[in-house]
From Swiss-Prot:
This is Uncharacterized 7.1 kDa protein in nolU-nolV intergenic region. Keywords: Plasmid. It comes from the Bacteria. InterPro entries: T3SS_stator_protein.
């Protein structure tokens, strides 16, 4: 059996059944986005601090051997 290669595949039709985010929850999602952004900024600050502390300790330990 061979496939008919002249026929283009048909893309599936996807339709949402309702609003993706109900209007009543928009503020909650906006607040969650702000919280996530703040958490990412905090994570970056902690990583920078930890990297600097590690480098300080490594530099301090190097002369002692």
């Amino acid at each position: 059996m061979t496939a008919d290669i002249s026929a283009a595949p048909v893309a599936p039709q996807m339709r949402p059944l309702g609003p993706l985010i109900p209007a009543s929850e928009l503020n909650i999602w906006h607040s969650a986005g702000d919280a996530l952004a703040a958490a990412k900024r905090h994570q970056q600050r902690v990583r920078t601090w930890a990297r600097a502390a590690y480098q300080r300790e490594r530099a301090r330990a190097t002369p002692r051997g």
